[in-house]
């Protein structure tokens, strides 16, 4: 193609707006009834989205920021590398993420590639990632008591301090992948005491223990409500681990496997 002779298709402002609105609302009409809502597009959330969508479940990820990756982008104190240990390397290999082996079972990964390919893998599997949306509450039902969806609001609306009611998204499973604060589970614990959720809070760093315990404790917190990634450490009172991300992707895969099994037999 000769760049000097390119003829650019002319599209006026009205068409731009109409096309964006039409296809955005098509997506929203579809996701308003989802199989799984994941809150947070960090490593555990995007890994979970990949495996859930790959299994054929309608999966949407709501991310409050205008980017994905969670803590990946910050690397280690803004250095652009992170550590992955086995067996999490198998997940990264599946997503075609390059690994630099530094010792047996330990790898260095470029943080930008890690988050970009995690997101691309989830999207290619069929998950929908929507930025700029905050989940500020859950939907629940009684008899039996369970979480059945979330309330969503534009992050910008909340930042502006405007009083605007949310919209609601139904789901058979809700995953809190919001990180250290476990924001969704914290709201559910406070507003629905009948769920009997106690949140002891995250402990200080102990990487070796934290990685294994985070994966082991990943799963259902209350009927319909699940914890993945750093939300697990907050809810279960586990240590943090710093810029080693094996547990994050393993936790994402584990919560997906648990949800797939739960929905299959529900």
UniProtKB/Swiss-Prot annotation:
<feature type="binding site" description="in other chain">
    <location>
        <position position="230"/>
    </location>
    <ligand>
        <name>NAD(+)</name>
    </ligand>
</feature>
<keyword id="KW-0520">NAD</keyword>
<dbReference type="GO" id="GO:0016763">
    <property type="term" value="F:pentosyltransferase activity"/>
</dbReference>
<comment type="similarity">
    <text>Belongs to the THI4 family.</text>
</comment>
<dbReference type="GO" id="GO:0009229">
    <property type="term" value="P:thiamine diphosphate biosynthetic process"/>
</dbReference>
<dbReference type="Pfam" id="PF01946">
    <property type="entry name" value="Thi4"/>
</dbReference>
<keyword id="KW-0784">Thiamine biosynthesis</keyword>
<keyword id="KW-0808">Transferase</keyword>
<dbReference type="InterPro" id="IPR022828">
    <property type="entry name" value="Thi4_prok"/>
</dbReference>
<feature type="binding site">
    <location>
        <position position="165"/>
    </location>
    <ligand>
        <name>Fe cation</name>
    </ligand>
</feature>
<feature type="binding site">
    <location>
        <position position="240"/>
    </location>
    <ligand>
        <name>glycine</name>
    </ligand>
</feature>
<feature type="binding site">
    <location>
        <begin position="163"/>
        <end position="165"/>
    </location>
    <ligand>
        <name>NAD(+)</name>
    </ligand>
</feature>
<comment type="pathway">
    <text>Cofactor biosynthesis; thiamine diphosphate biosynthesis.</text>
</comment>
<feature type="binding site" description="in other chain">
    <location>
        <position position="180"/>
    </location>
    <ligand>
        <name>Fe cation</name>
    </ligand>
</feature>
<dbReference type="GO" id="GO:0009228">
    <property type="term" value="P:thiamine biosynthetic process"/>
</dbReference>
<feature type="binding site" description="in other chain">
    <location>
        <begin position="63"/>
        <end position="64"/>
    </location>
    <ligand>
        <name>NAD(+)</name>
    </ligand>
</feature>
<dbReference type="InterPro" id="IPR002922">
    <property type="entry name" value="Thi4_fam"/>
</dbReference>
<comment type="subunit">
    <text>Homooctamer; tetramer of dimers.</text>
</comment>
<keyword id="KW-0479">Metal-binding</keyword>
<keyword id="KW-0408">Iron</keyword>
<dbReference type="GO" id="GO:0005506">
    <property type="term" value="F:iron ion binding"/>
</dbReference>
<protein>
    <recommendedName>
        <fullName>Thiamine thiazole synthase</fullName>
        <ecNumber>2.4.2.59</ecNumber>
    </recommendedName>
</protein>
<dbReference type="InterPro" id="IPR036188">
    <property type="entry name" value="FAD/NAD-bd_sf"/>
</dbReference>
<feature type="binding site" description="in other chain">
    <location>
        <position position="71"/>
    </location>
    <ligand>
        <name>NAD(+)</name>
    </ligand>
</feature>
<dbReference type="GO" id="GO:0052837">
    <property type="term" value="P:thiazole biosynthetic process"/>
</dbReference>
<comment type="function">
    <text>Involved in the biosynthesis of the thiazole moiety of thiamine. Catalyzes the conversion of NAD and glycine to adenosine diphosphate 5-(2-hydroxyethyl)-4-methylthiazole-2-carboxylate (ADT), an adenylated thiazole intermediate, using free sulfide as a source of sulfur.</text>
</comment>
<feature type="binding site" description="in other chain">
    <location>
        <position position="135"/>
    </location>
    <ligand>
        <name>NAD(+)</name>
    </ligand>
</feature>
<feature type="binding site" description="in other chain">
    <location>
        <position position="44"/>
    </location>
    <ligand>
        <name>NAD(+)</name>
    </ligand>
</feature>
């Amino acid at each position: 193609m000769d760049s000097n002779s390119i003829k650019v298709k002319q599209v006026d402002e009205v068409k731009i707006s109409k096309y964006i609105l039409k296809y955005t609302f098509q997506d929203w009409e579809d996701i308003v009834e989802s199989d799984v809502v994941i809150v947070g597009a960090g490593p555990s959330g995007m890994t979970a989205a990949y495996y859930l969508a790959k299994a054929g479940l309608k999966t949407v990820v709501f991310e409050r920021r205008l980017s994905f990756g969670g803590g990946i982008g910050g690397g280690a104190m803004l250095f652009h590398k992170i550590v992955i240990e086995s067996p999490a390397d198998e997940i990264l290999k599946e997503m075609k993420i390059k690994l630099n082996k530094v010792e047996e079972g330990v790898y260095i990964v470029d943080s930008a590639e890690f988050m970009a390919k995690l997101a691309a893998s989830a999207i290619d599997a069929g998950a929908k990632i929507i930025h700029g949306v905050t989940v500020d509450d859950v939907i629940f039902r009684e008899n039996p008591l369970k979480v059945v969806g979330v309330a969503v609001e534009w992050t910008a609306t909340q930042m502006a301090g405007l009083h605007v009611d949310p919209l609601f998204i139904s789901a058979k499973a809700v995953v809190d992948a919001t990180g250290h604060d476990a924001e969704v589970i914290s709201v559910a614990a406070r507003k629905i005491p009948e769920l009997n959720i106690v949140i002891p809070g995250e402990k200080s760093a102990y990487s070796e223990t934290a990685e294994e315990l985070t994966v082991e404790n990943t799963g259902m917190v209350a009927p319909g409500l699940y914890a993945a990634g750093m939300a697990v450490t907050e809810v279960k009172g586990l240590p943090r681990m710093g810029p080693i991300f094996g547990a994050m992707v393993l936790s994402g895969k584990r919560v997906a496997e648990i949800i797939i099994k739960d929905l299959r037999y529900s």
